[in-house]
């Protein structure tokens, strides 16, 4: 992108582009093979059964090898989940994705939620000329954000690699969880909206520094716990009440997002239960599960290559996830077929790093990783247990 809050970074796909991509892949690649049947608009009921939302028709599938269950960690989003608070009659309340379709202009906007959806809703409003003074942001927790500058692929991958090496050095030297986050913030790896409030939430969401500058214009920020009820003239929270009005639009961004169910083995005789096993990069790591299933013989060995972890929510979860990544990478690198696929896959964000070996940033980062990698793994384990 050349302009806007994403200037200098690879473009961000919108909802329509994402849907069009999956439709194209399904209809141009999968269905023509004759090996795939597609049942859109259905809900999985368990035990190989799914039901159409449109007609109520149901199907029972005989699983010949394994059922791949991606619903186990299925999260909730505002578009498909009702608000986790009461909404009185006469109150205007819409999920985040509906604010673009509002026809009657509200006097004010109240954005409810502390995560990425709420952040994006605030940025969207500000970018379209809504005055910061017309926005109230209710957030029960303050969050850390990953700097988009260090999350870019392809021609910008040297900065991603440099950012990873900075994290590893900080992880080797930190004396506590708070000290680690302070070091990463000082290096620009992590960002926060309000420098005066210490974040307690970290879900790995990404933002840019220009977006952050926009968000800091919002001064009406309410930190009184979770919203319990919206009445026509007031919003009831855990720790008090703030006024509202029928002419205010309340934007629901408070869905629970990523699920954190009890961990279970990913590979079992009759099923593959999709769960994270490394930090970030969902497309890469979940594709890697398919490679492991296809190239590794025994379930015990498969599970040893990718023991599951819970999705991250608190600050300390970042340490646990990164430790799992460092340990798991070493184990998977020792398996030839898995290592070869990982090295060549375009889903691997650093698969093209070899093309930049002469870049001084890459050479410096490689030396930093060699120097601090082992110490980082040991210290992360210690800090996570203490934190």
Each model region followed by its residue ranges:
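Glycine-rich active-site loop/strand segments that organize a redox cofactor
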Residues: 1-24, 138-194, 200
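Feature captures the FAD/FMN-dependent oxidoreductase FAD-binding
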Residues: 4-78, 204, 211-237, 366-380
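Glycine-rich dinucleotide-binding loop and its adjacent helix/turn
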Residues: 8, 14, 18-21, 69-129, ...
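Short hydrophobic core segments
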Residues: 59-76, 109-112, 245-257
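Rossmann-like dinucleotide/flavin-binding elements
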Residues: 98-146, 284-337
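Long, internal scaffold/assembly segments composed of regular secondary structure
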Residues: 159-252
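Extended alpha-helical coiled-coil/bundle linker/stalk regions that scaffold oligomerization
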Residues: 231, 236-299
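C-terminal active-site-capping segments
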Residues: 323-387
């Amino acid at each position: 992108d050349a302009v806007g809050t994403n200037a200098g970074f690879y473009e961000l796909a919108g909802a329509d582009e994402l849907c069009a991509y999956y439709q194209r892949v399904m209809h141009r690649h999968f269905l023509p093979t004759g090996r795939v049947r597609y049942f859109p608009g259905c809900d999985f009921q368990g035990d190989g059964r799914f039901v159409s939302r449109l007609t109520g028709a149901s199907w029972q599938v005989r699983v010949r090898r394994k059922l791949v269950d991606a619903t186990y960690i299925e999260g909730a989003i505002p578009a498909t989940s009702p608000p986790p608070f009461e909404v009185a009659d006469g109150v205007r309340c819409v999920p985040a994705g509906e604010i673009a379709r509002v026809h009657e202009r509200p006097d004010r906007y109240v954005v409810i939620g502390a995560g990425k959806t709420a952040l994006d809703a605030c940025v969207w409003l500000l970018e379209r000329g809504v005055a910061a003074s017309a926005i109230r942001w209710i957030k029960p927790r303050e969050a850390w954000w990953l700097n988009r500058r260090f999350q870019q692929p392809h021609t910008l991958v040297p900065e991603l690699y440099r950012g990873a090496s900075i994290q590893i050095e900080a992880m080797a030297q930190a004396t506590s969880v708070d000290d680690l986050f302070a070091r990463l913030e000082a290096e620009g790896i992590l960002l926060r909206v309000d420098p005066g409030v210490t974040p307690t939430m970290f879900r790995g969401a990404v933002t840019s520094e220009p977006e952050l500058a926009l968000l800091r214009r919002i001064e009406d920020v309410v930190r009184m716990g979770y919203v319990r009820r919206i009445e026509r003239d007031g919003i009831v929270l855990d720790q008090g009440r703030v006024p509202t009005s029928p002419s205010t639009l309340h934007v629901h961004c408070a869905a629970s997002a990523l699920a954190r169910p009890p961990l279970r083995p990913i590979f079992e005789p009759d099923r593959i239960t999709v769960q994270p096993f490394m930090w970030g990069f969902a497309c890469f790591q979940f594709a890697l599960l398919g490679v492991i299933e296809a190239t590794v013989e025994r379930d015990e060995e498969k599970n040893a290559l990718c023991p599951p972890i819970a999705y991250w929510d608190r600050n300390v979860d970042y340490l646990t996830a990164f430790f799992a990544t460092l340990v798991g990478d070493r184990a998977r690198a020792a398996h030839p077929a898995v290592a070869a696929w990982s090295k060549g896959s375009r889903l691997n964000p650093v698969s093209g790093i070899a093309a930049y070996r002469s870049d001084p940033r890459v050479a410096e980062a490689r030396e930093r990783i060699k120097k601090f990698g082992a110490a980082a793994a040991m210290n992360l384990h210690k800090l996570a247990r203490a934190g």
